[in-house]
Amino acid sequence: MKIKDHIGTYIKLEISGNKLISGILIDIGSDLWVIYNGYDYLYIPTVHIQNWKFPKEEEIDEIITLSDDQSPIFNPNEEISLRKTLTAAKGIFTEIYVTSKQAIHGYIISIMNNYFVFYSPIYKTMFISLNHLKWLIPYTNNQRPYGLSNANLPVNPSNITFARSFEVQIEKLVGTLIVFNMGENENAMGKITGIKNNFIELTTAKGNPLFLNLQHIKTVHMT
């Protein structure tokens, strides 16, 4: 079966983290699928699609029609990809989903080799591993997060210079108080002491050393 022959068909997917998504299959690229769920266009990296199916008509419990008020941000004449989509979303209010707890709202500032820099009005400057991005939703109707005005959303929210790789960027934060993975594990916050053999040494609030596997770091933000 050629999956691209089914563009425009209702589909159900399971994403990493036991998340279920259903909607209309809009496009498929080299490393990205686009689904319209009746409200938003979701851009889902292929690597996080655990399984999918085209349900039978009697299994579909919703009717989804494409909206004239919204359109995807990709060029229909080009093959879509995650990097192209992130680039197109720069400066657009965007929702991203990384951890199992909640979505993050804000703006993509910069796209590096294996991570991107994201500004959230709540968490401020964040570093997001591309390997752990489950999906993103760029909003194309001039929405602003939390009803904030442009004056409350700094164009250059950080004076930090960004390293090309996620690993080197974390190394630059040695001696800094940080929170990993949005605090989903209360132990994953403290002061970075160093990085060695793909493990981050963290000093916890009680002064104890804790070693975190770099490959399992999804997000980083400073306190």
Question: At which residue positions do the language-model features occur?
Answer:
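Short glycine-rich, low-complexity segments
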Residues: 1-105, 109-189, 193-223
